[in-house]
A protein has these predicted regions:
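Glycosyltransferase specificity loop/lid
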Residues: 1-132
Length: 132
């Protein structure tokens, strides 16, 4: 339906190279009158809010003293947050590395769109990503 304002859920993992490129899209969606809620780690709150989206922190963010362990646990925290609130949205926009995005959107009964912020891709990688 053309002109209908949507309530959009975005989710990303806490990597600047993946998050920063998505913020331009957020600004465009907000400027078009859509409401965007963005699930992200606390370190990105300021950037997300500056884009016009409502910041939604991960459920139970990881608290390990080992940075690599926190990175792995961020995936689970992002997943749990989407699963808890995702059905309340018109669609899910998720980033390349959030592999459960498509299956999670199907489970929630909402359409989804995958962002790819990486520029150097080949056919093999694109084919592999198309299967997730």
């Amino acid at each position: 339906m053309k002109g209908k304002k949507r309530h959009i859920l975005m989710v990303n993992l806490p990597y600047a190279g993946h998050t920063n490129p998505s913020l331009g899209l957020v600004r465009c969606l907000v400027a078009a009158g859509h409401e965007v809620d963005y699930i992200q780690a606390e370190a990105f709150r300021e950037r997300v809010e500056a884009s016009g989206a409502r910041f939604v922190p991960y459920d139970e963010p990881p608290q390990s003293l080992v940075p690599a362990l926190n990175e792995v646990r961020n995936w689970g925290a992002a997943y749990r947050t989407v699963r808890r609130i995702g059905a309340n949205y018109d669609c899910l926009i998720y980033e390349l590395l959030f592999f459960p995005g498509k299956a999670l959107a199907a489970e929630l009964g909402i359409p989804c769109y995958r962002l790819i912020s990486t520029f150097a891709l080949n056919r093999h990688l694109l084919r592999m990503l198309g299967q997730t």
